[in-house]
Amino acid sequence: MGQCRVFPGLRTLHQWVVHAPSGFAPLSVLFENRYTMKKIAAVALLTLGAVLAGCSKQEPAAPAATPAPAAVTKIVVGLDDNFPPMGFRNEKNELIGFDIDMAKEAAKRLGLEVGFKPIDWSAKEAELSGKRVDALWNGLTITEERKQNILFTAPYMENHQIIVVAANSAIKTKADLAGKVVGAQEGSSAVDAIKKDEAVFKSFKDIKTFGDNVTALMDLTTGRLDAVVVDEVVGRYYVAKKPDVYAVLDDHFGTEDYGVGLRKDDTDLHGKLDKALADMKADGVAAKIAEQWFGKNILK
């Protein structure tokens, strides 16, 4: 034990370390080199691990770009198609009327196509919020209650809720409506106006609502109603056609304004439409449309 059998003459490991034959590195050098190689290998492994770790960490995907909203090219107007002279059907079943012509002119100025969709007027707010129509443009009265859900343009016309009776009726004032049956369109501002005049409203025998004003006026003609409360523009249209059948009282249920109704978040269209209506008034086009339908300019 202790002798170096590989190289005779070098009896001990110490002698091998100190006196290694020529061409052989001393064990101390070999050991040192081996140690150095281990360090190099360790560093290399650490470096490789770091590189691989870096490669394995994928960069987070860039968030998908939010697509730009599609440009508006058309608006759909919701209306009651039995509301002359604002919007109704002629003998050819075509939609015509003052508000129809106003909407067409405004859309032309905005570079938009316009479509018209008859709706259940009592469900108009649901039609608008459900995006089945883009605007309510049909003698829509601006009220504080409606403002909670609808964005209105500036008023374009003043209106009154008038009282229409039979031409031979003994009813001459609101006070004469006590004990009478009064009709109005369901979901209309006529109903709201009546209820605001609490004393008169409570004096009625009954109030009946109808899907449209035409049906209410027919019931007035047959005697099932004693009076109908209706928008002035509509009431006077029918009275002018049948002055021997209907009459209008001097009393009415208040003054109100018409505006175009939009969704609350549709501020871009609101601004553009407001400007178009203002321009139409300024250049006289709106007045010409009014004169065509009412015989005079009744716009605000």
Q: What kind of region is each of these model predictions?
A:
Residues 104-109, 117-118, 122-135, 149-151, ...:
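Short helices/loops that flank or line small-molecule/ion binding pockets
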Residues 64-139:
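Extracytoplasmic small-molecule ligand-binding "clamshell" domains
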Residues 140-148, 193-198, 221-222, 226-254:
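A ligand-binding cleft/hinge motif common to bilobed small-molecule-binding domains
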Residues 81, 158-165, 236-278, 294-300:
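Periplasmic-binding protein-like
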Residues 63-69, 165-182:
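Flexible hinge/capping segments at coil-to-helix
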Residues 89, 103-111, 190-209, 239-243:
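Ligand-binding cleft/hinge of the Venus flytrap
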Residues 51-54:
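C-terminal motif of bacterial Sec signal peptides marking the signal peptidase cleavage site
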Residues 57-63, 189-208, 247-249, 278-300:
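Ligand-binding clefts/hinges and TM-proximal coupling segments of bilobed small-molecule sensing domains
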